[in-house]
């Protein structure tokens, strides 16, 4: 199983419930295919670098997971078929990128615990 990271952008016209439902659809698809979700981050509504389909903002979502290479084709096919997804990018992490992502997650979680204690 390889480490993968995917970032996808959802259309900005979605409500919070619709956005969460779309994210849940893709994470459940990964789990059904035997992938292990390592990390999920909602980056929120952000400005796009350039307009896509006359939209200038979008909801960014990051998902890190471990899966077999065959899962990626299924995931990307579902991204292409879903009208809510504006763009997506999936790439395989090498061992250095996986280590960096783990350190970043640990640093982020330690900052959150410090904020909770204050």
Swiss-Prot record:
<dbReference type="GO" id="GO:0005737">
    <property type="term" value="C:cytoplasm"/>
</dbReference>
<dbReference type="Pfam" id="PF01250">
    <property type="entry name" value="Ribosomal_S6"/>
</dbReference>
<dbReference type="GO" id="GO:0006412">
    <property type="term" value="P:translation"/>
</dbReference>
<dbReference type="GO" id="GO:0070181">
    <property type="term" value="F:small ribosomal subunit rRNA binding"/>
</dbReference>
<comment type="similarity">
    <text>Belongs to the bacterial ribosomal protein bS6 family.</text>
</comment>
<dbReference type="InterPro" id="IPR000529">
    <property type="entry name" value="Ribosomal_bS6"/>
</dbReference>
<keyword id="KW-0687">Ribonucleoprotein</keyword>
<dbReference type="InterPro" id="IPR035980">
    <property type="entry name" value="Ribosomal_bS6_sf"/>
</dbReference>
<keyword id="KW-0699">rRNA-binding</keyword>
<dbReference type="InterPro" id="IPR014717">
    <property type="entry name" value="Transl_elong_EF1B/ribsomal_bS6"/>
</dbReference>
<dbReference type="GO" id="GO:1990904">
    <property type="term" value="C:ribonucleoprotein complex"/>
</dbReference>
<keyword id="KW-0694">RNA-binding</keyword>
<dbReference type="GO" id="GO:0003735">
    <property type="term" value="F:structural constituent of ribosome"/>
</dbReference>
<comment type="function">
    <text>Binds together with bS18 to 16S ribosomal RNA.</text>
</comment>
<dbReference type="GO" id="GO:0005840">
    <property type="term" value="C:ribosome"/>
</dbReference>
<keyword id="KW-0689">Ribosomal protein</keyword>
<dbReference type="InterPro" id="IPR020814">
    <property type="entry name" value="Ribosomal_S6_plastid/chlpt"/>
</dbReference>
<protein>
    <recommendedName>
        <fullName>Small ribosomal subunit protein bS6</fullName>
    </recommendedName>
</protein>
């Amino acid at each position: 199983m390889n480490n993968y990271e995917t970032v996808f952008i959802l259309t900005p016209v979605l409500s919070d419930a619709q956005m969460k439902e779309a994210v849940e659809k893709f994470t459940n698809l990964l789990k059904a295919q035997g992938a292990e979700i390592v990390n999920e981050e909602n980056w929120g509504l952000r400005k796009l670098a350039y307009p896509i389909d006359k939209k200038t903002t979008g909801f960014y979502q990051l998902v890190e997971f471990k899966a077999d290479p065959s899962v990626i084709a299924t995931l990307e096919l579902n991204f292409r078929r879903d009208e809510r997804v504006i763009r997506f990018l999936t790439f395989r992490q090498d061992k250095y990128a996986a280590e960096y992502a783990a350190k970043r997650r640990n640093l982020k979680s330690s900052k959150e615990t410090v904020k909770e204690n204050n």
